[in-house]
C-alpha cells in the first residue's frame, strides 16, 4: 500500500494515492489538472482522510499544524512555527504563524486549532463526529493567547506530534465543525486554509477545485510559500482501470491514481512518471479471522504461511513497485522490525504443523 506524498512538479499541490501517474516532469504554471480518480470520496471530515479519495482532496484544501518531511521523516513547522512538550509527553504547546486564514476569511488562530483537536480527540456526539484514530489519551486544550495553544493528555502520548502531520489532522473552520457528519460528505461544506478551495461538485462524479490566490503559508521548509502553480484541479471519478490509463496515454488526463502493474510499462514507455511512495504505516496483507473454525488453530495459519511462496506471487503478478513485505509494518514505519526469517516459504516446515 502506498500513500502520503508530495509531487515537486506541482509545488503547492498535495496528493495521496497508490501507484499514480503524472504527465509532467517540470513545474506547470497555470491551467487545470485533470485528475482521474478510481473512486468517489465518501466523507471529508478530516479524520476520515485515510481513505485515498478523501485524503486526495483534503490534502489540497486543508493545512496541518506540522509537516512530516517524506525524505527525513522529521516533523517540521507548518501552521505551527514551533512547539514544546513536557518530559512525559502529556502536555504539548504550539506557537502558530501569524496571518493564516481559512478560505471564508476567518482566522486560523489558537481558538480554531483548539476546537479542531478537541473535536478530533474527544469527538462530538451532537454532530456525530467521531474521534480520530491517530489521537489517543486526549484530555483537553487551552488557549494561552491568540497564537498559542496547549494540549493535555491523560497518559503519555509520544505519537501526538506526528499525528498533527497526518491527513486526519487537517484544520477546518469553526463553521465546518458545526455541521453534522453526514453533511461533510459534500465537499462544498469543507472550509479549510489550504492552497485550493472547492468551487463545484457533482456528487459521485466530479469535483472542481480552484487555487487560492492569497495562499502564503506552505510548510516552512518548502521553497514555495505562495499560491499553487496550477489554476485548478478537476477530479473525475473513473472506476475502469482501462479508461484511466487510456485517457492518460491519449493526453486526455494529466494525472491518474491506481495504476495496475501490467499497465506500468506502457506508461513509462511514453515518458510518464509513476509515483509509488511506500507507506509509513501497515503493509498490505492477507489476514484470517481467528474465529473462523477452519483457521482457528494457530498451527493451521502457520502452515498456510510457510506453504505460500509470497515471493513468487509478487514477482509473477506485480512489479518492482510492489516489494515483498518483511513485516506487518512497512520498513519506513516507526517501530519496524525485520521479520523475514519468520515469513519464509518452507514446505517442509509447513508439513510439521
What residue spans do the PLM features occupy?
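N-terminal lobe/hinge region of extracytoplasmic solute-binding protein
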Residues: 36-87, 118, 191
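Append "and occasionally in soluble cytosolic enzymes with long acidic Gly/Pro-rich linkers
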Residues: 77, 211-216, 296-353
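Bacterial N-terminal signal peptides that target proteins for export
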Residues: 1-10
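Aromatic- and charge-enriched surface segment that lines or borders ligand/interaction sites
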Residues: 81-126, 144, 150-152, 294-296
Amino acid at each position: 500500500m502506498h500513500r502520503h506524498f508530495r509531487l515537486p512538479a506541482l509545488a503547492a499541490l498535495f496528493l495521496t494515492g497508490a501507484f499514480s501517474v503524472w504527465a509532467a516532469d517540470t513545474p506547470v504554471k497555470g491551467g487545470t489538472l485533470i485528475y482521474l480518480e478510481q473512486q468517489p470520496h465518501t466523507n471529508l471530515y478530516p479524520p476520515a482522510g485515510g481513505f485515498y479519495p478523501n485524503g486526495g482532496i483534503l490534502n489540497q484544501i486543508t493545512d496541518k499544524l506540522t509537516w512530516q518531511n517524506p525524505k527525513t521523516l522529521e516533523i517540521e513547522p507548518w501552521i505551527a512555527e514551533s512547539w514544546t512538550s513536557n518530559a512525559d509527553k502529556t502536555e504539548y504547546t504550539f506557537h502558530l504563524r501569524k496571518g493564516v486564514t481559512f478560505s471564508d476569511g476567518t482566522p486560523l488562530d489558537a481558538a480554531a486549532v483548539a476546537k479542531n483537536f478537541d473535536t478530533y480527540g474527544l469527538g462530538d456526539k451532537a454532530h456525530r463526529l467521531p474521534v480520530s484514530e491517530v489521537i489517543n489519551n486526549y484530555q483537553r486544550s487551552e488557549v494561552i493567547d491568540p497564537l498559542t495553544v496547549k494540549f493535555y493528555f491523560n497518559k503519555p502520548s509520544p505519537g501526538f506530534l506526528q499525528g498533527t502531520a497526518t491527513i486526519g489532522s487537517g484544520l477546518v473552520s469553526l463553521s465546518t465543525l458545526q455541521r453534522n457528519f453526514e453533511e461533510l460528505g459534500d465537499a462544498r461544506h469543507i472550509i479549510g486554509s489550504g492552497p485550493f478551495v472547492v468551487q463545484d461538485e457533482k456528487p459521485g462524479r466530479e469535483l472542481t477545485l480552484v487555487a487560492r490566490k492569497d495562499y502564503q503559508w506552505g510548510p516552512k521548509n518548502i521553497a514555495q510559500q505562495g499560491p499553487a502553480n496550477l489554476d485548478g484541479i478537476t477530479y473525475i471519478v473513473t472506476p475502469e482501470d482501462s479508461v484511466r490509463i487510456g485517457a492518460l496515454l491519449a493526453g486526455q488526463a494529466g494525472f491518474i491514481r491506481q495504476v495496475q502493474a501490467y499497465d506500468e510499462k506502457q506508461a513509462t514507455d511514453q515518458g510518464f512518471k509513476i509515483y509509488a511512495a511506500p507507506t509509513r504505516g501497515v503493509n498490505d496483507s492477507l489476514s484470517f479471522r481467528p474465529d473462523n473454525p477452519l483457521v482457528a488453530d494457530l498451527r493451521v495459519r502457520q502452515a498456510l504461511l510457510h506453504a505460500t511462496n509470497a515471493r513468487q506471487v509478487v514477482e509473477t503478478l506485480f512489479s518492482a513497485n510492489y516489494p515483498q513485505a518483511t513485516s506487518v509494518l512497512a520498513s519506513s514505519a516507526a517501530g519496524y522490525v525485520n521479520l523475514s526469517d519468520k515469513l519464509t516459504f518452507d514446505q517442509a516446515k509447513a508439513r510439521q504443523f
